[in-house]
Amino acid sequence: MSLPPLPALVVLDVNETLSDLSPLGAAFAAAGLQEHEAEPWFAGLLRDAFALTAAGAHPTFGELARESLLVRAHGRVADPDATAEQVLEAVRGLPPHPDVADGIRALTALGTRVVTLSNGPAATAEALLGRAGVADLVERTLSVDDAPAWKPDRRSYLHALDACGVGDAGEALLAAVHPWDVDGARRAGLRTAWVDRRGSRYPAYAAPADLTVTSLVDLADRLRAR
């Protein structure tokens, strides 16, 4: 059986796939909240975004992030606005995972185009790639702010393909840490790679990934060996 061709386009998720959210706990504590709140805050933000998208709304990441922090800080700190801004500044300055720079270099060395597609602002992704030293290797930093809906709505992935001039979804591969993102891309016709950074179990209710990798470097290695 012949192996599938190298994807013409690799679409990278940003939040948690490229960015390391682990420093957020300390940022929450420094802003007057609790360190353990960082992870449920981010999960709740995504939950509310998905619910609003399903209801027909199209909020921005910034709007939801700020308001959800104000709700969490209400009655607990003297200046909720300052607390929210302090946490958001930490979000905007998150570091990349250690494999990101080498992984993106390895992917582009294969001859495939690399872009990002985020539910967050394009500027945040651009700054993250700059800190990783690979901004010049990523063709475009796409955001659902310019798409009809948040990921995992299929329209967000098709928007990315259209922006990149890719007519056949099967010529693109999405790589993400979130099974819901992998599922959405798969249902939109893209090939997929689940970036399993934690040694987790992939949920059986999600459409399976074509590849399971541990890092972007591993992804490039797997594509090279196809």
Report residues per predicted region.
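Asp-based, Mg2+/Mn2+-dependent phosphohydrolase catalytic module
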Residues: 2-12, 101, 105, 121-122, ...
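Short, acidic loop-to-helix structural element flanking the phosphoryl-transfer center
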Residues: 62-63, 81-116, 122, 126, ...
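A metal-dependent, Asp-based hydrolase signature
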Residues: 35, 49-86
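Active-site neighborhood of HAD-like aspartate-dependent phosphohydrolases
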Residues: 2-46, 73
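Short helix-capping segments at alpha-helix termini
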Residues: 33-34, 75-82, 109, 133-137, ...
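Alpha-helical elements of Rossmann-like donor-binding domains used by nucleotide-donor carbohydrate transfer enzymes
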Residues: 26-27, 40, 67-68, 86, ...
